[in-house]
UniProtKB/Swiss-Prot annotation:
Gene Ontology cellular-component terms listed: chloroplast
UniProt EC number: 6.3.4.19
Superkingdom, taxonomy of origin: Eukaryota
Annotated keywords: ATP-binding, Chloroplast, Ligase, Nucleotide-binding, Plastid, tRNA processing
Positions with a binding annotation for ATP: S33, G34, G35, Q36, D37, S38
Catalysed conversion reaction: cytidine(34) in tRNA(Ile2) + L-lysine + ATP = lysidine(34) in tRNA(Ile2) + AMP + diphosphate + H(+)
Taxonomic source organism: Chaetosphaeridium globosum (Charophycean green alga)
Protein name: tRNA(Ile)-lysidine synthase, chloroplastic
Length: 341
């Protein structure tokens, strides 16, 4: 292996330690597509596996978006067989017409496999370039700081609660440790620990391409990535090249740095908001209350975060900017005699 590839592996290993992404002796599920980035990720993790003593497995999610997807899955099966790594293949049975529906379906596949096969970590091959493209995608769509931080190093995957398979006699792994909720619905402890990890966020797509070329890795490019009807692909092949040529050739590096800064700052404000929530909110029988006097003296940025956090955690309701502002104005205009919301 040449010097460039060794140096790249060292950088990734340093990021694993720096951001506390992966630990030794973990069972890791690697989500791959067969393209350059995911195959490089698979190769690097298989090299580091010797030192970190991981148990690796591969998952390929077939969205049925092109006629060659079955051939792509067979190619990946052969790769996994040659490497001696277990292979999982998920195939959708319903049309997936949007990126959001595809992501929800993928996460449901991750959920089932993680539950049955006892995985706590799923690793994806999102690169620094993907992070920049997602930054622009969210910016064009309209978002706040949390959206602009783009792809993050690690993310807890949230799932819908599943039915009680033991009571319904449906087929499932009944040996999984479970928790019983008040309404008779069963949820599984493994799900709460499931994390999505992105160890390549400091590596550009160009660097991954060079590694791939040096190692002569077996690729099967995903044809969906070239479909310009998909917004992300237009950003990749049209918007980014235009911005680099006419505005700043180092734009990718600059936007990646901004995303990393926003990630760190958002993490700080999230932790601060949680600590404040413990001070100004409390629960009574069948109710959750918020101290208005303490809320009103908070800075504007924290007021918005507290409202968002309060409704998400107590009522499982996702608020947009307009909702948050309406609630905030309502609270601020309440009489000073009102102590709680």
């Amino acid at each position: 292996m040449n010097h460039f590839n060794l140096k790249l592996i060292k950088r990734i290993q340093n990021d694993l330690i720096k951001y506390n992404l992966l630990k030794p002796k973990k069972s890791i599920l690697i989500a791959i597509s067969g393209g350059q980035d995911s195959i490089v990720l698979l190769k690097i993790l298989s090299i580091l596996q010797i030192q970190w003593k991981w148990k690796l497995s591969i998952i390929y999610c077939d969205h049925q978006w092109n006629i060659y997807s079955k051939n792509q899955a067979f190619h990946l099966y052969k790769v996994s067989f040659q490497m001696g790594i277990p292979f999982y293949h998920g195939v959708t049975i319903k049309p997936l017409r949007t990126e959001k529906s595809a992501r929800i379906w993928r996460y449901s596949v991750f959920q089932r496999i993680a539950s049955i096969s006892k995985f706590n970590v799923i690793v994806t091959a999102h690169s620094s370039t993907d992070r920049v493209e997602t930054f622009l995608y969210n910016l064009f769509r309209g978002t706040g700081v949390q959206g602009l931080q783009s792809l993050t190093w690690k993310k807890n995957i949230q799932f819908e609660i599943l039915p009680n398979f033991a009571r319904s006699k449906k087929s499932f792994d009944l040996k999984i440790l479970s928790l019983e909720s008040k309404n008779g619905i069963q949820t599984y402890s493994d799900y709460n620990k499931l994390q999505l990890i992105r160890p390549l966020l400091n590596i550009t797509r160009t660097e991954l391409g060079k590694f791939c070329s040096n190692e002569n890795l077996p690729l099967w490019p995903d044809l969906t990535n070239y479909n310009l009807s998909i917004i992300r692909n237009r950003i990749r092949y049209q918007t980014m090249p235009y911005l680099k040529i006419y505005f700043n050739c180092n734009l990718e590096k600059i936007l990646a740095q901004i995303a990393e800064i926003l990630y760190s700052e958002n993490l700080y404000f999230e932790n601060l908001s949680k600590k404040i929530m413990l001070k100004i909110s409390f629960e009574e029988i069948n109710s959750k209350k918020l101290s208005l006097s303490l809320f009103k003296i908070l800075p504007l940025a924290l007021q918005r975060r507290i409202i968002k956090f309060f409704f998400e955690n107590h009522f499982s309701k996702i608020l947009d900017f307009r909702d948050i502002e309406e609630i905030r104005y309502y609270i601020l205009n309440l009489s000073n005699n009102s102590k709680f919301l």
